[in-house]
């Protein structure tokens, strides 16, 4: 029989204490002391190293084996409550001390000032708490209520201040809501105005394009009919598409053949905008219609003229200038230039006469303009249909010639690079010369015919006039940004893939690009493999795209 189950000897101190103190019996504490003195449950419960407290190492084993045998408790919580009745308290272990605590993180350590190892006499000082504790608790409650009565006015004052501050915050929130609503309305008005401005800009550019076409056709007709023209100041057009055909259409432009405007495709054009778009240039069929302009020109130049005059410009043109520029014109290219769709062929040259030789027809590509770049491949031909140039008219008949120096800026230039038997026609909208050079080099290498424009307005006009297989669109450009240009293009062309080329690839920017109608994103800086991946994704058939993934092999498919 173990020592815990044996009765305590009558002459022992523990037995005497237990019999003499029935009201404040501490048998529970004595049983706990005797159990800790033994080593039978050392792995479950033991004294600490200092001996002034004990620790329950394994609460599960302690609850399962020890409590039912020695303390008649059904769970560990009731055992803890019993300890609390004898003024035992759990020792709190800080987080820093837990790292080096020798008994484990799940151990429970209890301590009483009079409960120490090998100190059985001190057990007499451990008494069970009596009902006086309840009285003291009630006294504490009474004192607390008295203190609360003293602090109630202060609490009421603080509460009133909080209510006042809350009401003030509510007023501020309502004011902010009203301001937000007003700002939203103002932004909506600004958006409508911005859309109207963009529509009018596009309409004005279309109107100017038709105007310059008509003037050019008129001057060509007069020159070919044998009439001599004086030196004229004729400005280059601000915007001409790649299929504008200046110099190739020698007949007058009537209202039936006027170019459609992009804004016809917009969802809600304004009345003033519609009137501006519907206005066409009336063809001038005889010199009589130009009499008022002739009189104005006679007053300014002091000459007797019988021909209509163009709008003034900063560059005058004379016979010598015409001869010099015509002499510097390069010979025709060996390879045919890729022409935009719906481009009428140039008419045959009229028969020459001895007295007044008629001018030969200008080539379909009105001027050659190249962005400075490295020497192109042998198959690369760069033919610019620059919107900042007017074609050379008649080298021997005092025609009108416009030099590229009349408009030195490159923001309005349009150039086309063709390859033999191109499989795809790509429009590159970019204003950076280095990016133009690299993209054009790779696109030509992959067998694509490339048209380059350098601003958003030219991009809109070019896409309206010519069908492209893919558009590479820069975002930050002069005149009109790429996102706005894409939104305008999507009003009349929803199928052509438009790829955004930008270094701004934040989530908000990407969402904006996609909302404006862009099909995909090509993040700058990119490699030729990235460019090829975009081309294969949007131009190749899915079967062809799956067969090869190497750019060197894919290049043969594109070509």
Curated annotation (Swiss-Prot):
InterPro entries tied to this protein: CheY-like_superfamily, HSF_DNA-bd, Sig_transdc_resp-reg_receiver, Sig_transdc_resp-reg_Skn7, WH-like_DNA-bd_sf, WH_DNA-bd_sf
Alphabetized GO MF terms: DNA-binding transcription factor activity; phosphorelay response regulator activity; sequence-specific DNA binding
Biased composition, class Pro residues, residue ranges: 342-365
Entry note about domains: Homotrimerization occurs through formation of a three-stranded coiled-coil structure generated by intermolecular interactions between HR-A/B regions allowing DNA-binding activity.
Swiss-Prot/TrEMBL keywords: Coiled coil, DNA-binding, Nucleus, Phosphoprotein, Stress response, Transcription, Transcription regulation, Two-component regulatory system
Domain Response regulatory: 425-539
Protein name: Transcription factor SKN7
Organism of this sequence: Candida albicans (strain SC5314 / ATCC MYA-2876)
Chain's gene name: SKN7
Region spans: DNA-binding domain: 25-131
Modified residues (4-aspartylphosphate): 474
Residues passing through the membrane, by range: none
Signal sequence, start to end: none
């Amino acid at each position: 029989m173990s020592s815990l189950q044996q009765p305590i000897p009558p002459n022992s101190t523990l037995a005497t204490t237990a019999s003499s103190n029935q009201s404040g019996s501490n048998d529970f504490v004595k049983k706990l002391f005797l159990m800790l003195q033994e080593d039978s449950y050392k792995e479950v419960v033991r004294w600490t190293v200092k001996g002034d407290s004990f620790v329950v190492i394994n609460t599960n084993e302690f609850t399962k084996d020890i409590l039912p045998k020695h303390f008649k408790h059904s769970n560990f919580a009731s055992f803890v409550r019993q300890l609390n009745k004898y003024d035992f308290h759990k020792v709190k272990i800080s987080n820093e001390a837990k790292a080096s605590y020798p008994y484990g993180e799940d151990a429970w350590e209890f301590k009483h000032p009079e409960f120490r190892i090998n100190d059985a006499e001190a057990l007499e000082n451990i008494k069970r708490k009596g009902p006086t504790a309840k009285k003291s608790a009630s006294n504490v409650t009474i004192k607390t209520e008295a203190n609360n009565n003293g602090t109630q006015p202060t609490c009421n004052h603080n509460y009133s201040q909080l209510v006042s501050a809350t009401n003030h915050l509510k007023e501020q929130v309502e004011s902010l809501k009203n301001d937000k609503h007003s700002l939203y309305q103002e932004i909506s008005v600004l958006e409508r105005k911005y859309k109207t401005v963009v529509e009018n800009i596009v309409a004005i550019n279309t109107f100017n394009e038709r105007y310059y076409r008509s003037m050019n056709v008129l001057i060509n007709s007069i020159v070919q009919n044998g009439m001599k023209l004086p030196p004229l100041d004729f400005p280059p057009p601000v915007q001409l598409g790649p299929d504008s055909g200046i110099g190739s259409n020698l007949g007058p432009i009537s209202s039936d053949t006027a170019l459609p405007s992009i804004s016809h495709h917009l969802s809600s054009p304004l009345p003033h905008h519609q009137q501006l778009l519907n206005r066409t240039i009336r063809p001038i069929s005889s010199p009589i219609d130009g009499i008022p302009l002739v009189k104005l020109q006679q007053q300014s130049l002091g000459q007797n003229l019988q021909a209509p005059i163009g709008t003034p410009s900063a560059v005058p043109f004379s016979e010598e200038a015409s001869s010099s520029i015509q002499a510097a014109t390069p010979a025709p290219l060996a390879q045919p230039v890729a022409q935009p769709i719906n481009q009428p062929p140039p008419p045959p040259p009229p028969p020459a006469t001895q007295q007044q030789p008629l001018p030969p027809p200008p080539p379909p590509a009105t001027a050659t303009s190249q962005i400075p770049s490295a020497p192109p491949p042998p198959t690369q031909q760069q033919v610019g249909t620059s919107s900042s140039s007017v074609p050379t008219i008649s080298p021997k008949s005092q025609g009108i010639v416009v030099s590229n120096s009349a408009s030195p800026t490159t923001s309005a230039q349009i150039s086309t690079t063709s390859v033999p038997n191109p499989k795809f026609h790509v429009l590159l909208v970019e204003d950076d010369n280095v990016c133009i050079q690299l993209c054009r080099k790779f696109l030509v290498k992959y067998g694509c015919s490339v048209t380059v424009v350098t601003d958003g307005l030219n991009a809109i006009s070019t896409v309206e006039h010519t069908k492209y297989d893919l558009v590479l669109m820069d975002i930050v450009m002069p005149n009109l940004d790429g996102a706005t240009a894409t939104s305008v293009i999507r009003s009349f062309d929803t199928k052509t893939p438009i790829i955004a080329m930008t270094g701004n690839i934040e989530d908000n920017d990407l969402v904006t690009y996609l909302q404006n109608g862009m099909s995909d994103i090509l993040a700058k800086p990119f490699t030729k493999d990235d460019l090829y991946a975009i081309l294969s994704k949007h131009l190749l058939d899915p079967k062809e795209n799956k067969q090869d993934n190497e750019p060197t092999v894919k290049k043969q498919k594109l070509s």
